[in-house]
Amino acid sequence: MLFGSLDAGRSSFVSAGAKFAPDGVGRDGPVTLATLGYGLRPERDWWGDPRAQAGRPPRTLRHTVQAGAVAGWQWARDWGVAALFAGPELAFEVLDSPGTERLPAPRLGARMQAELWARPTDATLVTATLIGGTARWSAWGRVSWGVRLPALSEAYLGPEAALYADRTGYRKWSLGLHATDFGLPQIILPQMSLPQLRFRVSAGWVYEEQIRRPGIYGTLTAWLPL
């Protein structure tokens, strides 16, 4: 399975990756997951700019690159799939600041990941994802619930909530609505034969503790079983 995602807002993150299950994504068995992502977020430069000494730190940008390769086991049941992963991760981050005299070295760490994709009934979907890593001492989690209304859409529609935190003290909370597991109509891509290409979109309210102002966010995820 190939996948990619974009999380856009005041801070943004884009990633892509692949999942491989030798016995099939719908069966019990081993599974591996590899990802590569890039993030960009604004923050105050309290350390590298002289204006910070006067209490007026300018805004700067933090660039982050993360990569991970984890392996684990998935359990497939009639109600859905659950999986646990562990493996190494690599992180590199740098500030657009006068105090950045040279690029820092990448940091190596360990990553743990848990996923749940469950259908309690034929018309409902519950998802949960939790990722924790030591390269940046970061954690990200998201839960969602959705209901499928065939008269309106093939997607599951419902609420979602997410939280991200890392060692810098940065915290980002979000609450919104999502549409999960739908394809593009042929009228949009009439020349492409990708009936298995699926999508997830969401949008809502986000609050970043360091900025202390609410904002809005939007996400787009696509996956293609192979």
Predicted features and spans:
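Outer-membrane pore/translocation modules
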Residues: P30-S138, A161, R171-W173, A203-Y207, ...
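Transmembrane beta-barrel domains of outer membrane proteins
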Residues: K19-D23, V70-Q74, Q113-R119, S144-R148, ...
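Short loop/turn motifs that connect adjacent beta-strands in outer-membrane beta-barrel proteins
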Residues: M1, D23-V31, A76-A82, R119-L125, ...
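Short glycine/proline- and aromatic-enriched beta-strand/turn motifs that initiate or cap beta-hairpins
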Residues: M1-A52, T221-L226
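Glycine/small-residue-rich hydrophobic helix-like segments
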Residues: L152-L184
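A mid-sequence, solvent-exposed acidic-amphipathic segment
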Residues: T129-R148, L152-Y156
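Outer-membrane beta-barrel "beta-signal"
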Residues: S11-A16, L177-A179, I187, R212-L226
